[in-house]
């Protein structure tokens, strides 16, 4: 899978009231806290740019799938998301996404990355009924129930100190 197109030619848009539309499919490396986009799950990008009174309106629609590891059972799942973005950018002003409108090409990979990162959770749970891993043997309790006897938890974490011969 090729990388998603993130550079676009906007040379003609500031000289007219025209509108430019692009569509691109591909891969972009985004990783965060056990989540990551993969080459097997393409990102679909639709973008429309329009010049309106010395500002550039960007309307962006993003469909993507990322792999996320469950915080309880450590299973990897594919999470599908859709994200929309609309904002106005002025040619001679700086912006939060480091997009330079002074040149004939704009690079929007930072904008796409931020939209994807905002959808990735720090702690992902595969479902509400996830039982997680066994604290004794480490087996996934969603797949099988452990047969070993349960460990008797003592009242205090310091109660094992009473067993020391001093």
Regions picked out by a protein language model, each given a short descriptive name:
Residues 1-166:
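Structured interface patches
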């Amino acid at each position: 899978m090729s990388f998603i197109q993130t550079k676009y030619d906007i040379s003609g848009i500031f000289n007219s009231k025209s509108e430019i539309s692009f569509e691109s499919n591909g891969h972009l490396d985004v990783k965060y806290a056990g989540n990551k986009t993969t080459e097997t799950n393409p990102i679909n990008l639709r973008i429309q740019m329009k010049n309106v009174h010395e500002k550039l309106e960007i309307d962006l629609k993003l469909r993507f799938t990322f792999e996320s590891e469950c915080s309880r059972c450590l299973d990897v799942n594919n999470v599908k998301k859709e994200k929309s973005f609309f904002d106005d950018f002025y040619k001679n002003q700086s912006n939060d996404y480091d997009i330079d409108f002074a040149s004939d090409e704009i690079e929007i990979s930072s904008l796409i990355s931020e939209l994807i990162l905002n959808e990735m959770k720090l702690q992902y749970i595969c479902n509400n009924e996830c039982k997680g891993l066994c604290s004794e043997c480490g087996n996934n309790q969603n797949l099988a129930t452990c047969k070993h006897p349960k460990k008797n938890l003592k009242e205090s974490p310091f109660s094992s100190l009473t067993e020391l011969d001093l």
